[in-house]
Amino acid sequence: MSIPGLGQAVHAARTAAPAAVAHTNIHELQANSEWRFEVAIGSSIEVKVLSGTAEIFGTELAVNHTYTFHGTKSSIYTWHGCRLEVNGPCEEYTAEETPMISYINTHFALENLRSDAKKAGQDGPRVLIVGPNNTGKTSLAKLLTAYAVRMGRQPIVVNTDSREGMLSIPGSLTAAAFKSIVDVEEGWGSSSTSGPSPVPVKLPLCYYYGLPSPEDNVKLFKPVVTRLALAATSRLQDDAVCRETGMIIDTPGVISQGKGGYDLISHIVSEFAVNIILVLGSERLHSEMLRRFSTHKTDNGEAITLVRLDKSGGCVDRDDAFMQQMREATIKEYFFGDAKRTLSPHTQVVNFDELSIYKVKEAHSMQSAFLPGGEEEVEPTQYEKVEPTPSMLHCIFAVMHASTRDSQDTIRDASVMGFVYVAEVDEKKKRMKILAPLNTRVTDRPLIWGSWPEAPVNLMG
């Protein structure tokens, strides 16, 4: 299963407007400058470092190696200056003002905490990154992860943003231990596939939420986060190198505003025993976090440190159309691979009565508001069991590590085996054709149908 990250970009700005590049160009970058580029969906560029040193979100680029980037917004930074060869069409410009000094200082501060943790036999820093949408949270998470790996560390990286996938399809929450370099061409890299990979693959633990925003169903989001935290914390305790390195936790921008969002941040802080909070691009959020956590301590008695970091000027707004195209590209690559690896999904036809499909409920917290006297449901459920219908065409189902006989709570807490795509629904014959990464039975597993990612285009066309 090839599951690239979404490759979104961060990093600082300059007032100059981007210029279109259509052919081979040579760029001479001065020390402490950044080359920012945007590649349209369906297009690609090739970049080669001819001399000097350069990196993408902390991962160093090899000299004279050609890197290919498809449909992304990204940046290349150089500490000492470099010479780049760029081949292909993109929007690009060079910025000299960047927040990299503050970011690298943050990395060194975390390294000191990791060294202290190793000496004391304690847990390393559990870092939570918060901030509004499009402030570079994921890019900072990549950068801190890459720098930690370059120091010989093995951070556990956690994604709690269901709108974008980390080593998985959007709609899921994941955690993975990073022991090797991040694949700069694929964002976070890829998980294990049936084909070869030039960069060591990652092995994520995946849980399915299935909605775009935590606020769409808080009563489902919170227990899924709790289960993810339990799994990540257990891994931390079982691996000495991971334990001293700690965690890096990415969050959705939507929870960085309003009381409901702040309560979700508090839940994440509590479940992951967070002791470092990095606030990106919002003084108001930083003030609120100080009010909530300046006197707060973890269960181990550790104080919570808050650090406000500037948003990079290179952060750009990614409109809904761009993000939808990215999700569709991610799903297509999951089943069919990319330009480097061609994958062949297995096709199987299953009868309607063989499937156990559960639909994720939305806005469940609102339903009890209409009960008399403010009463709540005795046993609220997060899923609704549904029969196959034509509306499932082109949708994605999560195949759970559970039995069809299990309770809904057990199914919710189970990890994801993989995903299947509904290629055809035949109501007359009561059959459904699905695509799966591997030739495996899905009829003995519960399938979860969420509204996120939304139904993509016809992958078979």
Swiss-Prot record:
This protein's record includes keyword Transmembrane: no
Single GO molecular function: polynucleotide 5'-hydroxyl-kinase activity
Residues at which ATP binds: E34, K73, N134, T135, G136, K137, T138, S139
One Pfam family named in its UniProt record: CLP1_N
Domain of life assignment: Eukaryota
A cellular component annotation (GO) from this entry: mRNA cleavage factor complex
Gene Ontology biological process terms in this record: mRNA 3'-end processing; tRNA splicing, via endonucleolytic cleavage and ligation
Classification via Gene3D superfamilies: Clp1, DNA binding domain, P-loop containing nucleotide triphosphate hydrolases, Pre-mRNA cleavage complex subunit Clp1, C-terminal domain
Protein location: Nucleus
Keywords from the named record: ATP-binding, mRNA processing, Nucleotide-binding, Nucleus
Homology family: Belongs to the Clp1 family. Clp1 subfamily.
Quaternary structure, from the entry: Component of a pre-mRNA cleavage factor complex. Interacts directly with PCF11.
Chain's role: Required for endonucleolytic cleavage during polyadenylation-dependent pre-mRNA 3'-end formation.
The protein, known as: mRNA cleavage and polyadenylation factor clp1
Species in which this protein is naturally found: Botryotinia fuckeliana (strain B05.10)
Origin organism lineage: Eukaryota, Fungi, Dikarya, Ascomycota, Pezizomycotina
Gene from which the chain derives: clp1
